[in-house]
C-alpha cells in the first residue's frame, strides 16, 4: 500500500511539473492574448469567484525567464489595449522594474484613457492614471 502511495505521489508530482512548464512559443501566445484583453481585473470575480484570464496570464508570464521583456513589449505596443498595459505594469511592479520614471515615458498615450475594470461582478470605467498609481503604490498581487 505504501509503495502504491509513493508511486502515485511521484507520478502526480512529475505531471504537475510538466504542466507548469511552458516554452517560449507558449509565452508568445500568452503575450498576444494579454495584449488584446478588454478589461482589467484582479482577484476573484463573478458569481463563482474566478481569477481573470489577464491575471492568469500575468502569473504565467512571471514564470518566464524573459518576463521583463514580455511586459515591456506589451507596455510599448501601440496596438495593445490600455487594460493590457495595466497588466504589464502589474508584472513590472512584481518584478521590481516599475518606478516613477516610467510614468510618462511608457504610459503617456494611455494616461487619460478610460479603462474597463471588473470588480466582483460589476464592470465599470476608471481612468488609467488612477489605476496606475494604485499599482505603483500598492502592487497587484
Placement of each model-derived feature along the sequence:
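Bacterial N-terminal signal peptides
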Residues: 7-14
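Alpha-solenoid helical repeat scaffolds
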Residues: 87, 118-121, 131
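HEAT-repeat alpha-solenoid elements in large eukaryotic scaffold proteins
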Residues: 37-51
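Amphipathic alpha-helical scaffolding segments comprising HEAT/armadillo-like alpha-solenoid repeats
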Residues: 23-40, 64-75, 98-112
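Positively charged n-region of N-terminal signal peptides that target proteins for export
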Residues: 1-4
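Residue-level detector of extended alpha-helical repeat arrays and alpha-solenoid scaffolds
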Residues: 51-54, 84-85
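Alpha-helix N-cap/helix-start positions at coil->helix boundaries
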Residues: 80-82, 113-116
Amino acid at each position: 500500500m505504501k509503495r502504491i502511495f509513493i508511486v502515485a505521489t511521484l507520478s502526480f508530482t512529475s505531471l504537475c511539473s510538466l504542466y507548469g512548464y511552458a516554452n517560449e512559443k507558449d509565452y508568445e501566445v500568452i503575450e498576444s492574448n494579454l495584449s488584446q484583453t478588454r478589461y482589467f481585473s484582479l482577484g476573484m470575480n463573478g458569481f463563482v469567484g474566478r481569477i481573470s484570464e489577464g491575471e492568469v496570464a500575468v502569473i504565467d508570464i512571471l514564470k518566464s525567464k524573459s518576463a521583463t521583456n514580455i511586459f515591456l513589449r506589451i507596455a510599448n505596443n501601440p496596438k495593445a489595449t490600455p487594460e493590457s498595459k495595466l497588466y504589464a505594469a502589474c508584472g513590472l511592479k512584481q518584478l521590481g522594474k516599475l518606478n516613477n520614471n516610467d510614468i510618462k515615458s511608457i504610459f503617456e498615450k494611455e494616461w487619460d484613457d478610460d479603462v474597463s475594470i471588473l470588480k466582483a461582478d460589476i464592470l465599470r470605467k476608471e481612468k488609467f492614471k488612477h489605476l496606475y498609481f494604485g499599482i505603483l503604490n500598492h502592487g497587484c498581487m
